[in-house]
């Protein structure tokens, strides 16, 4: 098998509408059309899809996913101005410039500006 890329990342959220407000309005993703699959939304994040799925219980899954940004300092400033707590970590050669935040449901997200 040779993967062609990542199609989407699925995230369980307790409230799909609140999730949409954060990922679309705060993080700037674009809402996509979605078939009738129950409560949830599909979003575009620069050509990669993020699927929000409303769930009363969050199953075990990935620890975090990373959002690539062109200017991490500008992204951090923008998020902080919107009241989001963002933790920037020291630069690690080979890993790029990184910062971490949590969505309203406690899911961990990484911002990554490649070297």
What are these regions (language model features)?
Residues 36-39, 59-61, 93-97:
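Short acidic/glycine-enriched loop/turn segments that link adjacent beta-strands
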Residues 10-49:
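Core segments of cupin and vicinal oxygen chelate
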